[in-house]
C-alpha cells in the first residue's frame, strides 16, 4: 500500500539529520503558532497565498529564496568543515554517503531554489512597473508558477527526513543516476523536484515574454525599455528555449529508472553522452538566465547612483542579445575531456571566448557610467562595484578554462569550483542583494538600514575571496572536487583558509538578517513618502511606495528612455490627473495552491512508488485545472472612489515631503 515507504526511511541513526529535522519542525510549529496567535490565517490566504498581484508574488519568491539560502549555505559550511578535517587526517563528521547527498543538494538548492526564485522574484516585482503595466499578461499562471516552485522546495526538504537525496552531483549524470547504481529514492527526489518546479519556470518564461512584448505603456518602444526589462526579456527567451530541454531530458531519465528503457545506458543502444549533451544544452543557457537579469539590476543601479544617464544604452542592449544567442553554442566546454575531438573542442573553445566580448562591453559601459558621475556610495552601489571586481576575476578564469588544453589540466578540479562560484556569487548573488536593497523601498515603503547593509557587503566580499581564492591554488595543485575522505595533508592549510572564508560569509548572511530585522523595527524612521527615494529614472519610481495593487491610476505615456526622469525634468512627475476611470483587474484565485498541493502528493507518491496516491494526486491536479478553466468570475473593476482615495493619500505624502509637480 505504501510502496517503498517504511519507517526505515527516516534516518534515526544520523544525529546531524535528526537535529536538523527537529529544528525545522520546531521552527515550523513556532511559525504556525504565531500566525494562529495573531489571527492572520484569513489575511494570509486572501492577501498573499491566493494573490495574483505580481508584486506580492515577487516578494514571496524572494522570501523562499532567502529561506533556502540558509539551507543551502548550511550545506556549504558542512562541506568546507568536512574537507578541512579530512585533510588533517581525521574522518570528519560526515560519512561519505551523507557528504555526497550534501554536495548534490547544495548545488540543486542554490541554483534552482535560491538563484532562480530570487531572480524571478525581482522580475515579478519590477518589470510590470517598469513598463507601465498593471499586472502580467497571465496573472493566474504567475500564481501557479510560484506554487510549482514551492512544490520543488518541499520535496527537496522532505528528502532530508524521509529517505535520502541523490548522491550524484547536481546534474545527476548517468550511469550513476541510473537504477543500477542508484537504486534508492534519492535520484527520484531529484527528478520530481526539478520536473515540477521546472514547469513553473517555463510558465514564468512564457508569461513575462508576452507581458514585455504586449503590455508596455503607450510610447514605450523596444529601445525605450529600461535595461533591466531588456535583460529580463532575453532571460525569458532563454527560459522558453532551454527549459523544455531539461524537461525532456529528465523525463527520459525517469523512463530509464521507472520503465527500464535504455536512453542513457551503454547497453541496449543507449548513450550516457547524449544525456550530458542535453543537460548542458539546458545548463549553460541557465547560467545566463540567472546572470542577464542581474546585469540589468547593475545597469539601473549604476545610472541611479552615478547621477547620470546610463552610458552606451544601445550597446548594452545588443550585448545582451548577443549573449542570449551565443549562450546556446558554448555548452560543450563543460566536457572538453570527454572525447569529442580537437576540432569540436576548438570550435566550442572559441565560441566561449567570444561570449566574453559582449560581457566585457557591459563592464566598460558600467565603468563609463560611473566615470565623472557624482557617485553615491550606497550599499546597492557597493554591491555593484564589488560585482565588477569579483565578476571580472571569474570571467578571466572562465576564458582560461575555455582553452581546451588548460581545461584538460583543470577539469573537475577545485579551480573549476572556484571559477563558477566566482561568477555565480560575484554575479548572481551580489546582484540579487543589490536589487533587493535598491527596490526594497518600492516593495515595502521604507528603506533598508545602511549600516548593517554595508557590514553585510564587506563580510560577503572579503569572505568570498578568502573562501575561494585558495581553491584556485588547490586546483593547480591537483585537488579534485567532491572529496570527503583521505584528502592529501598538503592541502590542509588552504582548506582551513577556505573554511574561515565560509565563516566570514556566514557573518555576512547574519548581517543581512539583522539588517532586515532592524529595518522593519525602525521602518517609521525610514519611510519613503515620495515613491522615489533614490532619485530614480524609470517608471517604477513614478508610483507610491509600496505601489497600489493597480500600479498606475493613469497609465503613463512614455516619450523618452528615462521616462520618469523626463517627467521630473518637465515638472510633470507629481501632477494630479484631471479625472480617474475604473480599472480592470484580475481576482485572486486559490486554484494555484490547490494544484500545487496535489502536485506535491503526486511527486511524493511517484518517488516512493505509491501508485494509488500518485493517481489521486494527478487526478486532483487535472480536475482542479478543469474546474478553474470553467470559472468565468476572474476579474472585476476597481471603482473610481477607491482609486481617488488611494491616490489622494499618495499626493498628501508627496506634499508632506515638500515636493510639488516634480520640482
From Swiss-Prot:
Annotated Pfam families: COX1 (PF00115)
Any GO BP: aerobic respiration
1'-histidyl-3'-tyrosine (His-Tyr), cross-linked positions: 284-288
Transmembrane annotation, as ranges: 17-35, 53-80, 96-132, 138-161, 185-215, 225-260, 271-307, 312-326, 341-369, 378-409, 413-445, 449-477, 490-521, 588-606, 614-632
Effect of residue 75 to H: No quinol oxidase activity, altered binding of a semiquinone intermediate at the QH site
Remaining remarks: Ubiquinol oxidase catalyzes the terminal step in the electron transport chain.
Family: Belongs to the heme-copper respiratory oxidase family.
Protein name: Cytochrome bo(3) ubiquinol oxidase subunit 1
Annotated organism of origin: Escherichia coli (strain K12)
Amino acid at each position: 500500500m505504501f510502496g517503498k515507504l517504511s519507517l526505515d526511511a527516516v534516518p534515526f541513526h544520523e544525529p546531524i539529520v535528526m537535529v536538523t529535522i527537529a529544528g525545522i519542525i520546531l521552527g515550523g510549529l513556532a511559525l504556525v503558532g504565531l500566525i494562529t496567535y495573531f489571527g492572520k490565517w484569513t489575511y494570509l490566504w486572501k492577501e498573499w497565498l491566493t494573490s495574483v498581484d505580481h508584486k506580492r508574488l515577487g516578494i514571496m519568491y524572494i522570501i523562499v529564496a532567502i529561506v533556502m539560502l540558509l539551507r543551502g549555505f548550511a550545506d556549504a559550511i558542512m562541506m568546507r568543515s568536512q574537507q578541512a578535517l579530512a585533510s588533517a587526517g581525521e574522518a570528519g563528521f560526515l560519512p561519505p554517503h551523507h557528504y555526497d547527498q550534501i554536495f548534490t543538494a547544495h548545488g540543486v538548492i542554490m541554483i534552482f531554489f535560491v538563484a532562480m526564485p530570487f531572480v524571478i522574484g525581482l522580475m515579478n516585482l519590477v518589470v510590470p512597473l517598469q513598463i507601465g503595466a498593471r499586472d502580467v499578461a497571465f496573472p493566474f499562471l504567475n500564481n501557479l508558477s510560484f506554487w510549482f516552485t514551492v512544490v520543488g522546495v518541499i520535496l527537496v526538504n522532505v528528502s532530508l527526513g524521509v529517505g535520502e537525496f541523490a548522491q550524484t552531483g547536481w546534474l545527476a549524470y548517468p550511469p550513476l543516476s541510473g537504477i543500477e547504481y542508484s537504486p534508492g529514492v534519492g535520484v527520484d527526489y531529484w527528478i520530481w523536484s526539478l520536473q515540477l518546479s521546472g514547469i513553473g519556470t517555463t510558465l514564468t518564461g512564457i508569461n513575462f515574454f508576452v507581458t514585455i512584448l504586449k503590455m508596455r505603456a503607450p510610447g514605450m518602444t523596444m529601445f525605450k525599455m529600461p535595461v533591466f526589462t531588456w535583460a529580463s526579456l532575453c532571460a525569458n527567451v532563454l527560459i522558453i528555449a532551454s527549459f523544455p530541454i531539461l524537461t525532456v531530458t529528465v523525463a527520459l531519465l525517469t523512463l530509464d529508472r521507472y520503465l527500464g528503457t535504455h536512453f542513457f545506458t551503454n547497453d541496449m543502444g543507449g548513450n550516457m553522452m547524449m544525456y550530458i549533451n542535453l543537460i548542458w544544452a539546458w545548463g549553460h543557457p541557465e547560467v545566463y538566465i540567472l546572470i542577464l537579469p542581474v546585469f540589468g539590476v547593475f545597469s539601473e543601479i549604476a545610472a541611479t547612483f552615478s547621477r547620470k544617464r546610463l552610458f552606451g544604452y544601445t550597446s548594452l542592449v545588443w550585448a545582451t542579445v548577443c549573449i542570449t544567442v551565443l549562450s546556446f553554442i558554448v555548452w560543450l566546454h563543460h566536457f572538453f575531456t570527454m572525447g569529442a575531438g580537437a576540432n569540436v573542442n576548438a570550435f566550442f573553445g572559441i565560441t566561449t571566448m567570444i561570449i566574453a566580448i559582449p560581457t566585457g562591453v557591459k563592464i566598460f559601459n558600467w565603468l563609463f557610467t560611473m566615470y565623472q558621475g557624482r557617485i553615491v556610495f550606497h550599499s546597492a552601489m557597493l554591491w555593484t562595484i564589488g560585482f565588477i571586481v569579483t565578476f571580472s576575476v571569474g570571467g578571466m578564469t572562465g576564458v582560461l578554462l575555455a582553452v581546451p588544453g588548460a581545461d584538460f589540466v583543470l577539469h573537475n578540479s577545485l579551480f573549476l569550483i572556484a571559477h563558477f562560484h566566482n561568477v555565480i556569487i560575484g554575479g548572481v548573488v551580489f546582484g540579487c542583494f543589490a536589487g533587493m536593497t535598491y527596490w526594497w523601498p518600492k516593495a515595502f515603503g521604507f528603506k533598508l538600514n545602511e549600516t548593517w547593509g554595508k557590514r553585510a557587503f564587506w563580510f560577503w566580499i572579503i569572505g568570498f575571496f578568502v573562501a575561494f581564492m585558495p581553491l584556485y591554488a588547490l586546483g593547480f595543485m591537483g585537488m579534485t572536487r567532491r572529496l570527503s575522505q583521505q584528502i592529501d595533508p598538503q592541502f590542509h592549510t588552504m582548506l582551513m583558509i577556505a573554511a574561515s572564508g565560509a565563516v566570514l560569509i556566514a557573518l555576512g548572511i547574519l548581517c543581512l538578517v539583522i539588517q532586515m530585522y532592524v529595518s522593519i523595527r525602525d521602518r517609521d524612521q525610514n519611510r519613503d513618502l515620495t515613491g522615489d527615494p533614490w532619485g530614480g529614472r524609470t517608471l517604477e519610481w513614478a508610483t507610491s511606495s509600496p505601489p497600489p495593487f493597480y500600479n498606475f491610476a493613469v497609465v503613463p505615456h512614455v516619450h523618452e528612455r528615462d521616462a520618469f526622469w523626463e517627467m521630473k525634468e518637465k515638472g510633470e512627475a507629481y501632477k494630479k490627473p484631471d479625472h480617474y476611470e475604473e480599472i480592470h483587474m484580475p481576482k485572486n484565485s486559490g486554484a494555484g495552491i490547490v494544484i500545487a498541493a496535489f502536485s506535491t502528493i503526486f511527486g511524493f507518491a511517484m518517488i516512493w512508488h505509491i501508485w494509488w496516491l500518485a493517481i489521486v494526486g494527478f487526478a486532483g491536479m487535472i480536475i482542479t485545472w478543469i474546474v478553474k478553466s470553467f470559472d468565468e468570475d476572474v476579474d472585476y473593476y476597481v471603482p473610481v472612489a477607491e482609486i481617488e482615495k488611494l491616490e489622494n493619500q499618495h499626493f498628501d505624502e508627496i506634499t508632506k515631503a515638500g515636493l510639488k509637480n516634480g520640482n
